Amino acid sequence: MANKNFSLTVYDSEYMETNNKIYQENMEKKIRTISEFPDKVLLKILSLLPSKDVVATGVLSKRWRSLWKDVKTFRTSSVESLQLKINPSATNKDIQSLVNMAVARSMRELRIEMICKNFELPKSFYMFSQLETVILDKVSLMDPPPDVHLPCLKRLHLLSVNSLTNVMIFTIDVPTLRILSIDNTSGKSRPKGVHGFVINTPSLSVNVVFDNPYKFLAPLGSTQYLSLCSVTSHTTYRPAVFSFIFLDHLELCLCSAEQWNLLTRILNYAPRLRVLQLKLYHKHCVKDTKNLMGNQPDLIPKSLSSHLEILEWRQYNDTAQEREAAKYILANASGLRKATFYTESTEKHGMLKEVRMCGQRFKNMSACVK
C-alpha cells in the first residue's frame, strides 16, 4: 500500500548554490556586526561560552585571532590535563592560582615548563592532589616540603629540577607511583651539593638520567623496571650495597665506560633479572666503550647464571671491547632464550656465527643479528 503522505522535493544545483551563497553572506554580515562591538563587550560574551568554543573563535578573523587569550574565565567540565609554559615574568601568585585550579578541578595531569624561574608550589599540590601525572621541566622549587604525599600519583617526571633550599634529601612517599623519570642532564641550572631521594614506591618503573646515578640507586630496591643513563664516567659516590631483589627488566645506556662497572654491580644484587637491554637513549648520547669490560667479576652473578632470558643490544658495532662484553654475557647466561644484536655493520653473517658459537652450549637459545 502506497504511503499517501510521502513527498519528494528536488532542487537543481543552481538553486542550491544560490541558497548557500545567501547563507554565507548572512553569516559574514553577522560576524561583521558582532566585530563592531568593543573588546570589553566581546570578552564578556566569550566569558559565558565553554572554553572549547572560545578558542574556536580564533579562526574568525585577524581581530579574533588573539582576543580569546584575554578571557579570564574558563568554563569546562571535562578538562583532565593542564600544560603551563610559563614566562619568567610570571609571578608566584599567578602560578599558584593556576596550580590550585588544577587541584580543585581534580585534573589528572599537570605539566609545568619554565626557564630558570624560581617558584613555590602551593601546599594543596603536595597534600590534596588527585593528579596521576606530574611533569616539572626546568623548574627551581622554593621551599618544597621534605615529605611529599600524592595519593593518586602514577607518573612523575623531574626534568632539570632543583631546589633552592637547604633540603638535601627528599622523601617521595607515593605507594601508587609506577613511573619515575629523573633527568638532570639538560639546562644550565643544576643542583648544588648531593641531592638524594628516599623513595617508597612498590612496583616502580624508574628512568634515571643523571651525572651520577649511584645517588639514586640505593632507595630503589623495590623496583621491577629500571632504566639508567649516566653521562659521565666519574663517580664520586657509591653505596656499599645495592639490593634489587625484585628487578625484572634493566635498560642501560652505553654513553659511559662506567656503565659496565655499574652493570656488573647491579647484576650481583639483582638475582631475578630476566631482561637486559643495552642501547643509547638520547641524541646527545655518544657511545663510550673504552675499557668496557673493566675487571670481570670473580663470581658469575646469579642473575646471569640462572635467570637472564632476553638480551637486546642496540647500536652494536662489534668492536673488540663490545665483543668481549657480549662473549662474557653469552657464555655465562645459561638460561638465555633470546639474544638480539642490532648493528649497521655489513658483517652481520660473521657476527651471527660468532654469537651462536658463544651460546652454542645452550640448546634453547635463539640468536639473531639485525
UniProtKB/Swiss-Prot annotation:
Gene3D superfamilies: 1.20.1280.50, Ribonuclease Inhibitor (3.80.10.10). Residues 292-343 form the FBD domain. SMART domains: FBD, FBOX. PROSITE patterns: FBOX. InterPro entries: F-box-like_dom_sf (IPR036047), F-box_AtFBL13-like (IPR053781), F-box_dom (IPR001810), FBD (IPR006566), FBL13/AtMIF1-like (IPR050232), LRR_dom_sf (IPR032675). Residues 31-77 form the F-box domain. CDD domains: F-box_AtFBL13-like. This is Putative FBD-associated F-box protein At1g50980. It comes from Arabidopsis thaliana (Mouse-ear cress). The lineage of its organism: Eukaryota, Viridiplantae, Streptophyta, Embryophyta, Tracheophyta.
